[in-house]
Amino acid sequence: MATLGVNIDHIANVRQARKTVEPDPVQFAFLAELGGADSITVHLREDRRHIQDRDVFLLKETIKTKLNLEMAATKEMLEIAKKILPDYVTLVPEKREEVTTEGGLDLKSNVQYLKKAVGSLKDSNIEVSAFIDPLSEQINYSKEIGFDFIELHTGKYAELSGSNQHKELQRIIESTHIANDLGLVVNAGHGLNYNNVRKIASINNMNELNIGHSIVARALAIGLEKSVREMKSLITLN
């Protein structure tokens, strides 16, 4: 049964729109946990457009579940991660002009550098995940580089409909099986919402789904704790 990681970046987006102190994403992480979140995910971007260093340090000290730190594999971020010591790090691609992460890491072109980055994090007892597109080549490189987890990018699945969405779902299912056979733990995320999450959650051996925007959007209408509870019930429905 898949677990739920709640991404709270969008809470920080609202705060940073006014460069003020509220809403505090640390407080909302507490509410997400009350709603049943199994982990809290934040993306500390190089430009600090939403989550700030202070948020990540406080989350590490206060949350009761696990902390998943998304970040680019830069020297600065590696040093920060080794100070914070999150439960795990998810390495993601990052472009300054993008609104949100647009695709998975290209592992093939960065094998040697990523081996060093992953090794450095593991030396600090941090488990490491790669955010990748559901492609067998990327999965094989994930294993070669030494990642513990992969997070499959579900953005294309979320954008499609009908038979095209079904084809993408099959690709995600096949990718999950390939990764499991290699000993990799599989997470998934990006674009998942209350309408499309069930089929991803029901994939055999899917470990965790990381979801943010749709939960926060629904929370504006019904409150964060309740919106997390509703998403958790969809993921864990037998």
UniProtKB/Swiss-Prot annotation:
Gene3D superfamilies: Aldolase class I. The record marks E151 as: Transition state stabilizer. Its main location: cytoplasm. CDD domains: PNPsynthase (cd00003). It catalyses: 3-amino-2-oxopropyl phosphate + 1-deoxy-D-xylulose 5-phosphate = pyridoxine 5'-phosphate + phosphate + 2 H2O + H(+). The keyword Zinc does not apply. InterPro entries: Aldolase_TIM, PyrdxlP_synth_PdxJ, Pyridoxine-5'_phos_synth. GO terms for cellular component: cytosol. The active site is at H43, E70, H190. SUPFAM superfamilies: Pyridoxine 5'-phosphate synthase (SSF63892). 1-deoxy-D-xylulose 5-phosphate binds at D9, H10, R45, H50, T100. Keywords: Cytoplasm, Pyridoxine biosynthesis, Transferase. It comes from the Bacteria. Pathway: Cofactor biosynthesis; pyridoxine 5'-phosphate biosynthesis; pyridoxine 5'-phosphate from D-erythrose 4-phosphate: step 5/5. GO terms for biological process: pyridoxine biosynthetic process. 3-amino-2-oxopropyl phosphate binds at N7, R18, G191, G212, H213. GO terms for molecular function: pyridoxine 5'-phosphate synthase activity. Pfam families: PdxJ. It is found in: Cytoplasm. Homooctamer; tetramer of dimers. Belongs to the PNP synthase family. NCBIfam families: pdxJ (TIGR00559), PRK05265.1-3 (NF003625), PRK05265.1-5 (NF003627). Catalyzes the complicated ring closure reaction between the two acyclic compounds 1-deoxy-D-xylulose-5-phosphate (DXP) and 3-amino-2-oxopropyl phosphate (1-amino-acetone-3-phosphate or AAP) to form pyridoxine 5'-phosphate (PNP) and inorganic phosphate. This is Pyridoxine 5'-phosphate synthase.
